Design a protein with these regions (language model features):
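Bacterial N-terminal signal peptides that target proteins for export
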Residues: 1-3
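Hydrophobic small-molecule pocket/channel-lining residues, especially in calycin-type beta-barrels
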Residues: 14-161
Length: 161
């Protein structure tokens, strides 16, 4: 019992790291209109608000932010793991804990995109997010592995409101 209390207190005793400075993630800050085209052809439109949270350690993306009754709602947190030298993505949505996930990915050499990989017992999922600095548009390609084959689950296009 004492050991558990000690282990729980260790993170509290350490000072938090300095605010994360990341020019790539800074591009998420703001309000966005998102068009999501599902693999079955269905289209969903929603709003996303991006902001720095948790002492500037994560970008929070709130799908459905400001909508009265959003068709889809999710909270996505993206941060950087300094030890592993990769980005982390925590995703939770209206489909519940069964579908929540932790993905990891590296920023491409041109500083324009990250492909996050989420692994589970049912297979893998990737989400390749990219930013075009000229048009200021985000894109996202979400693919899912089913029976050894990769299929497009959804494609998104984000434009600033």
């Amino acid at each position: 019992m004492v050991l558990l209390l000690f282990l729980a207190a260790v993170p509290l005793a350490a000072a938090p790291p300095p605010a994360l400075k990341d020019r790539f993630l800074d591009n998420f800050v703001g309000d966005w209109s998102v068009v999501r085209k599902m693999g079955n052809g269905r289209t969903i439109e929603s709003s996303v608000r991006g902001e720095w949270v948790l002492r500037h350690q994560f970008i929070q993306l709130h799908y459905g932010a400001g909508e009265k009754e959003p068709e889809y709602e999710a909270l996505v947190f993206i941060g950087f793991d300094e030890t592993a030298k990769n980005y982390v993505c925590h995703s939770v949505d209206v489909f519940g804990g069964r579908y929540s996930g932790l993905g990891r990915g590296k920023l491409d050499p041109n500083l324009l995109g990250i492909e996050f990989r989420f692994d589970s017992k049912k297979g893998s999922l990737t989400n390749r997010v990219g930013f075009d600095p000229e048009t200021k548009i985000w894109t996202s390609l979400i693919r899912q592995e089913e029976n050894g084959q990769w299929k497009t689950l959804a494609e998104e296009k984000w434009t600033r409101k």
